């Protein structure tokens, strides 16, 4: 019994709203099998499928899926089944799935099959559970049988990046793997030994030791540390800066005589009334 897909809240993305951009060279070309009238059009659809699913890095002759191409040319399968076959191929498994963690595999696959990035980490976790319980093939089937895929591409359209703005196209982003694969290669090179047992097997420099420690471990360790301010260092730094500063003497002697105020006779009102002293 497979685990149902966990719920997640979609985030704001360009593809979720209608756009009113003027078409330009960045506007995606829609490849539709129903519009193909000759073999050249079918070749263009096949090429677009390879470019979208395998990305630019894996479009080589040895990675072609001749059986799927033949079925599509003879209309034995539709475009959605052709895309499904590319996702389940050994090329996609060995060159994409096996080189990435489940979280990154989810993000890459969503970009190539649904034309958008993952909404958030909750979606990555939800789909990674599907990968863990149903495998890569079950994950591919779940995406291509989803309502989102059917509403945007149906059975006849090659998936494309929906409403790309400013960023590079998904199929041109390098590399296809990240530090996760490099860390695995390091562990394989150690042959199952721990870092400390490998250290005693020969003379290592500090650079060798730094390369043996995974970068993601250092990043995680840095997040755990509580940021603290070194007040002692701050006080010492400020003290060293101001101890040699000479404050200029801005005082000056008063040379102008002090102004004295003397009383002045003033004609006050009602001075004409007898008996009132108004002066």
From Swiss-Prot:
Cite the Pfam families for this sequence.
PBS_linker_poly (PF00427)
Query: What is its subcellular localisation?
Result: Cellular thylakoid membrane
A single GO BP term for this record reads:
photosynthesis
GO CC annotations, alphabetized: phycobilisome; plasma membrane-derived thylakoid membrane
The main location class comes to membrane
> Where in the numbering of this chain does the PBS-linker domain appear?
11-189
Against Gene3D superfamilies, the record matches this protein to: Phycobilisome linker domain
Kindly state which keywords UniProt assigns to this record, in alphabetical order: Antenna complex, Membrane, Photosynthesis, Phycobilisome, Thylakoid
**Topological type in the membrane:** Peripheral membrane protein
User: Subunit info?
Assistant: Part of the phycobilisome, a hemidiscoidal structure that is composed of two distinct substructures: a core complex and a number of rods radiating from the core.
Q: Which family does it belong to?
A: Belongs to the phycobilisome linker protein family.
User: Which PANTHER family does this UniProt record tie to the protein?
Assistant: PHYCOBILISOME 32.1 KDA LINKER POLYPEPTIDE, PHYCOCYANIN-ASSOCIATED, ROD 2-RELATED
What is this protein for, i.e. what is its function?
Rod-core linker protein required for attachment of phycocyanin to allophycocyanin in cores of phycobilisomes. Linker polypeptides determine the state of aggregation and the location of the disk-shaped phycobiliprotein units within the phycobilisome and modulate their spectroscopic properties in order to mediate a directed and optimal energy transfer.
- Name the chain's protein: Phycobilisome rod-core linker polypeptide CpcG1
Lineage, uppermost ranks? Bacteria, Bacillati, Cyanobacteriota, Cyanophyceae, Nostocales
Report the gene name: cpcG1
């Amino acid at each position: 019994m497979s685990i149902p897909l966990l719920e997640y809240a979609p985030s704001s993305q360009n593809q979720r709203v209608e756009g009113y951009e003027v078409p330009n060279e960045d506007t995606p070309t829609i490849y539709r099998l129903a519009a193909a009238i000759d073999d050249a059009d079918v070749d263009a659809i096949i090429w677009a499928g390879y470019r979208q699913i395998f990305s630019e890095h894996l479009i080589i002759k040895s990675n072609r899926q001749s059986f799927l191409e033949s079925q599509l040319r003879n209309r034995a399968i539709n475009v959605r089944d052709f895309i499904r076959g590319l996702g389940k191929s050994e090329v996609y498994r060995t060159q994409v799935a096996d080189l990435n963690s489940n979280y990154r595999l989810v993000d890459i696959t969503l970009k190539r099959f649904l034309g958008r990035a993952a909404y958030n980490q909750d979606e990555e976790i939800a789909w990674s559970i599907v990968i863990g319980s149903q495998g890569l093939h079950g994950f591919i089937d779940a995406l291509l049988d989803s309502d989102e895929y059917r509403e945007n591409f149906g059975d006849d359209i090659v998936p494309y990046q929906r409403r790309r703005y400013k960023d590079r196209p998904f199929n041109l982003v390098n590399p296809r793997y990240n530090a996760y694969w490099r860390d695995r290669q390091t562990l394989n090179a150690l042959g199952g030994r721990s870092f400390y047992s490998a250290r005693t097997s020969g003379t290592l420099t500090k650079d060798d030791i730094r390369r043996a420690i995974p970068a993601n471990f250092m990043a995680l360790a840095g997040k755990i540390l509580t940021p603290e301010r070194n007040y002692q260092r701050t006080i010492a730094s400020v003290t060293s800066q101001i101890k040699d500063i000479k404050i200029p003497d801005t005082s000056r002697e008063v040379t102008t005589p002090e102004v004295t105020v003397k009383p002045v006779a003033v004609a006050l009102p009602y001075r004409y009334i007898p008996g009132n002293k108004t002066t």
